[in-house]
Amino acid sequence: MRKSLVIVLLMGACLGNAQAQLHLKANIQNNHLWRGMEVSDGVVLLTDLSYTMAHDHVTVGLWGGTNSEGSYKEFNHYLNLKAGGWSLALWDTYNFSPGANYNNHQYWNYSAHSTGRFLDATLAYHFDEKKFPLTLSWSTVIFGRDRSSDNEHQKYSTFVYAEYPIYK
């Protein structure tokens, strides 16, 4: 008990001077794309509730989406750490889609062989936004329903991209 109290007090002292912001965002779209794949068509409502702290270096959030037919539902938790142009994001993604070939009935199941979720890690570098607004990103599914056909091994599917705005 005493150690827990000391840890909580130290964390409070470290974060006591840090600025924090609460963000709530909602989008209505005509479909939902993820890494170039259509996840849902039709009218889609996407929401994001996040809390940013430590002078914009740490963000934790909840992200959700659903479509107008109710055939697509998604709920994610995420953590994003930023420092010196670098960012590391960890996303815990869970879809509640009917007809899925994965377990979408046990939300808290984190068993590697039977979970319906996946954990995604993204490492990105953001160059100077005013001089050279390029972002390079590497994302890998590190756990969950990205398994080999015999369900024995994680496949570690990876998505790499470069992003450069041509019009602002």
Predicted regions and their residues:
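Transmembrane beta-strand segments of Gram-negative outer membrane beta-barrel proteins
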Residues: Q19-N30, L81
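Glycine- and aromatic-enriched membrane insertion/assembly motifs of diderm outer-membrane
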Residues: S40-D92
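Detector for outer-membrane/organellar transmembrane beta-barrel domains
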Residues: N109-K168
